[in-house]
Regions:
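Glycine-rich loop(s) and the adjacent beta-strand/alpha-helix scaffold that form part
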Residues: 1-82
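FAD-dependent oxidoreductase catalytic-site/capping-region signature
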Residues: 64-68, 78-277, 285-295
Length: 295
């Protein structure tokens, strides 16, 4: 089965899927294509490079004098009640967003604008997919909004069903390691604020005994996870930039009839969540395509 486009094809597979599809089509970094035995149809060295993401550091604090979702989810009976509350009244914990509180902050006074984003949840767990803790706790997740580290994503082989190889290279730059350590210190400062004193926060992760810069950086690597904001693997740029994949009209450089309209075209990651900027990119792509079609 095949499908042909009369005018244009628009790739919107995201910062992971788009470079993967390009490489499977023979478009990309010659050495990456050679590694999987894919003939080079169009060389573009920037495909799959420049991967950026927001690494979240999940600090956890045990609390007292208040219930959290950790407690309620230990009971099958209460789980059933939460389900019924949602089904019949569309209310309760199952209506909650992934985070119930967010804030922007600076890791140090050296930054002119906020370089951190916090997400706070009334629950905790050791790792995603594992059960919630049996003790009451809150999670203060903090991410570096402007990481300096860069990674890459490339096809693992010619099989389109095989997952691509993703190397984010988190904390590979000294600046990111410094911000990570300062972020944990700031999370501790927030937990120690007078307003939270009645709840007696006690640090569970990464551990109050970790105080040196080296220990905090190591802990950041252990408690850090993606916040699911991958971008920039098919970045927009000028013709003078050899790593640019698309031009200012989102057209794949050197090809006709192919555009990209997703988070992969961002030259740099945004200082906040990536969903709304991606919607803007899609709307702009539609506007550009309509304008070009009228020429």
């Amino acid at each position: 089965m095949s499908a042909l486009a009369r005018r244009e094809i628009v790739l919107t597979a995201g910062a992971i899927g788009t470079p993967h599809l390009l490489e499977l089509s023979g478009i990309g970094r010659p050495e990456a294509l050679a590694r999987i035995g894919q003939p080079v149809l169009h060389a573009l060295p920037g495909v799959g490079e420049n991967l950026q993401d927001h690494l979240q550091l999940r600090t956890i604090f045990k609390i007292g004098g208040a219930r959290t979702l950790n407690h309620d989810f230990q009971s099958r009976y209460k789980q059933a009640l939460m389900g019924l509350d949602y089904i019949f009244k569309r209310r309760g914990p199952l209506t909650m967003a992934p985070s119930q509180l967010g804030l922007f902050a600076k890791s140090s006074a050296d930054y002119a604008t906020a370089n951190l984003e916090f997400h706070v949840q009334p629950l905790s767990l050791d790792r995603f997919g594992e059960p919630l803790h049996k003790f009451p706790a809150i999670t203060l997740s903090v991410c570096n909004l402007r990481p300096a580290s860069r990674g890459h994503v490339h096809a693992a082989g010619k099989d389109s069903n095989a997952a691509p190889l993703i190397q984010p290279n988190y904390l590979s730059e000294e600046e990111d390691r410094r911000v990570a350590a300062d972020s944990i210190r700031l999370a501790r400062k927030i937990a120690g604020a007078p307003a939270l004193a009645p709840f007696k926060p006690q640090e569970y992760l990464p551990g109050a005994g970790l105080t040196s810069e080296e220990d905090l950086v190591k802990a950041a690597g252990e408690i850090g996870t993606t916040i699911f904001h991958p971008v920039s693997t098919a970045k927009m740029g000028r013709d003078s930039d050899p790593m640019a994949v698309v031009d200012v009209r989102l057209r794949v450089r050197g090809l006709t009839g192919l555009r990209i309209a997703d988070a992969s075209v961002m030259p740099r990651i945004t200082s906040g969540n990536t969903n709304s900027p991606t919607l803007m990119i899609a709307e702009k792509a539609a506007e550009l395509m309509l304008a070009d079609a009228k020429r």
